[in-house]
From Swiss-Prot:
It comes from Escherichia coli (strain K12). Residues 1-26 form the signal peptide. Residues 87-110 are annotated as: Disordered. Keywords: Signal. The keyword Signal applies. One of its GO terms (cellular component) is cell outer membrane. This is Uncharacterized protein YidQ. It holds the Pfam family DUF1375.
Length: 110
């Protein structure tokens, strides 16, 4: 009896920990829109360059990713884009705007 309960607990824990991998990976970056993990899994499944092992894992993970993306939908709607890439792009745009206003220095005549 205890062995069956322990086995069921281990299986459920493993499914919970492994489920929604695409969703978790997609949410670690910048703003990807809504349902980023599900879109990533669908793209991976439809890609001809993806091997059969990865496709089978993506197919197995797809329902869990869809559930995780649904649970994280409010976060996707209200979060701000604070990825490293977006911060660097914003900083470079500010630097370009500053440099456009400041005229270049004159070179001394020899």
């Amino acid at each position: 009896m205890i062995r069956n309960v322990l086995l069921a607990f281990m299986i459920c824990s493993g499914m919970t920990l492994l489920g929604g991998c695409s969703s978790v990976m997609s949410h670690t970056g910048g703003k990807e829109g809504t349902y980023p993990g599900t879109r990533a899994s669908a793209t991976m499944i439809g890609d001809d360059e993806t091997n059969w092992g990865t496709k089978s894992l993506a197919i197995l993970d797809m329902p869990f990713t869809a559930v995780m993306d649904t649970l994280l939908l409010p976060w996707d709607v209200f979060r701000k884009d604070s990825s490293v890439r977006s911060r660097v792009e914003k900083s470079e745009a500010n630097a370009q705007a500053t440099n456009a206003v400041i005229p270049p220095a004159r070179m001394p005549d020899n």
